[in-house]
Amino acid sequence: MLGVLTHHWAKADKVDEARKLLDHNGEAQSKAPGFVSRQTLLSRSDPTKITTLVVWTTNEIYDTWRASPERAVAMSGADALWSKPPESERFNMAE
């Protein structure tokens, strides 16, 4: 299993819009083959930081999602919401 931890920093005046976009993306992810689960974490120290942890069955399945037209639609306009580029890292899930 693969865990993908991604930090997003929304522009201060776009936090609500950014959360809605990420929630919409999560809904789209949940319909994709190989999706397992998704959690959204909100930073206690930085109100603009939204982190997601998404679990997929395999690295290849996640790569397929990243290249999908469904993801492109779900994340359309996202770049205008971030104060800096998102940072993502892939992890093996411990059993």
Describe each PLM feature range:
Residues 1-2, 95:
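Absolute protein N-terminus
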